[in-house]
Design a protein with these regions (language model features):
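Trp- and S/T/G-rich repeat-edge/linker motifs of beta-rich repeat architectures
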Residues: 1-16, 20, 24, 30-73, ...
Length: 189
């Protein structure tokens, strides 16, 4: 049977991702009314018995460059770290915790600017396979329905270097950290 858990203290109106990490359940939410520009991330040791606590509570001073900069739409555990994917109009970002402890002001930017294509604004799926974290990078869904544009598949290694696995030339080229956009390693465009 199902058990309802108390989520009354969670801000936002849409849950995008859940992951278990170091004996806690993490959930990210998006506040669609605010445009999803605030990282809303919560943790609980056991939501049946303990309320979720906010990782980035209102009022905390978030240091620039040390925290996700928008709504977290996908998460994965990789290399004993929590990775958070941020979908935003200025291009996808991927962040990771600096240790196995998840806390504010202790994150590293792994990728930005949509992996070198500012048209990549959404992360729809992430997964770990053979020592790499794979991330799907998609264009704005409304325009992709009118003019099919495909998606990019990226892989990130344990040193946070990323490579284009499948995808073509950038629609809106941009510089990025920890990798550079070139030919896909699979040859698929």
């Amino acid at each position: 049977s199902w058990i309802e858990v108390d989520t009354s203290n969670l801000r936002g109106n849409s849950s995008r991702s859940m992951v278990a990490f170091n004996n806690k359940l993490y959930i990210s939410t998006i506040d669609e009314a605010l445009g999803g520009n605030t990282p809303l991330l919560y943790a609980s040791e056991d939501p049946e018995f303990y309320r979720f606590t906010e990782i980035f509570p209102e009022g905390i001073k978030l240091e620039k460059g040390k925290n996700p900069t928008g709504g977290i739409t996908n998460m994965a555990v990789f290399n004993n770290r929590l990775y958070a994917c941020v979908s935003k109009d200025s291009g996808i970002e991927v962040w990771r915790t600096n240790s196995s402890k998840v806390q504010a002001n202790d994150w590293t930017l792994v990728a930005n600017n949509g992996f070198g294509d500012l048209a990549n604004v959404s992360v729809l799926a992430v997964g770990v396979y053979k020592n790499h974290l794979y991330v799907s990078a998609t264009k704005k869904l409304s325009s992709a329905l009118i003019l099919p544009q495909g998606f990019d598949l990226i892989r990130i290694n344990k040193n946070d270097r990323w490579q284009l696995v499948a995808g073509g030339k950038a629609y809106i080229p941009a510089k990025t950290v920890n990798g550079s956009r070139g030919e896909s390693i699979s040859g698929f465009k």
